[in-house]
Design a protein with these regions (language model features):
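Hydrophobic anchor at the beta1->P-loop junction of P-loop NTPases
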Residues: 16
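P-loop (Walker A) phosphate-binding loop of NTP-binding proteins
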Residues: 19
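Hydrophobic positions on the alpha1 helix immediately C-terminal to the Walker A/P-loop
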Residues: 27
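ATP-dependent small-molecule kinase phosphotransfer cores
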Residues: 42-102, 116-118, 128-133, 143-145
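Small-molecule kinase domains that catalyze NTP-dependent phosphoryl transfer to phosphate-bearing small molecules
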Residues: 98, 131-180
Length: 190
């Protein structure tokens, strides 16, 4: 069941999820450029809220951990956008596929899988620094996020049941990933 339509199109065409460094943001930019779609990035919502409160990301993450209602309010905002008639066609966040699944949205729910070594390499390329430090930060963030998702929603990121498309992109270039996703969108009859 779709939440609704806009000009005959489903509101949300695709949710894109994956661990940090998996290429979700790159894919979103490519799809939006190719199709003229709009997107909403859960990380951007998180960063904007942190900035609005005058807090660095690490401190805002602690606030979300200590005050779960703050984190829930951000996720509620994403869920509302997913159902809004004027909402974007692409939603990017680690839990977007879960929200679409729970809301019964008829869209592609994509999970990008990438090995820890490749994610670390990509993060290092993007942010610079030392590989060991990048790995440590990535592992700490993933552990903290996994705990938070479990405590808030009883969701395990290891559970892929909400996702109707999973892609391992270790050896794929960004355009190859976008081409494969566009083929999936076409086969679904976007």
């Amino acid at each position: 069941m779709c939440a609704g339509t806009r000009g005959g199109d489903d509101l949300v065409q695709i949710t894109i999820s994956g661990h940090p460094g998996s290429g979700t943001s790159t894919l979103v930019h490519l799809l939006c450029d190719r199709r003229g779609w709009r997107s909403l990035n859960g990380g951007d919502v998180f960063r904007a809220e942190a900035a609005g409160r005058g807090l660095p990301l690490e401190e805002f993450s602690r606030l979300c951990r200590d005050e779960p209602e703050v984190d829930r309010a951000l996720d509620d905002r994403l869920r509302l956008e997913m159902q809004a008639e004027s909402g974007p066609e692409v939603i990017e966040s680690r839990l977007a596929g879960w929200w679409a699944h729970q809301l019964g949205l008829d869209c592609i729910k994509l999970w990008l899988e990438v090995s820890p070594a490749e994610r670390s390499r990509r993060i290092l390329e993007r942010e610079g620094g030392e590989l060991s430090a990048a790995l440590e930060r990535m592992n700490e963030r993933m552990a903290a996020d996994a705990l938070r998702y479990d405590l808030l929603y009883s969701i395990s990121l290891a559970d892929m049941s909400p996702y109707n498309l999973q892609m391992n992109t270790d050896s794929m270039q960004p355009d190859e990933v976008a081409d494969a996703v566009e083929a999936a969108l076409e086969s679904q009859g976007d």
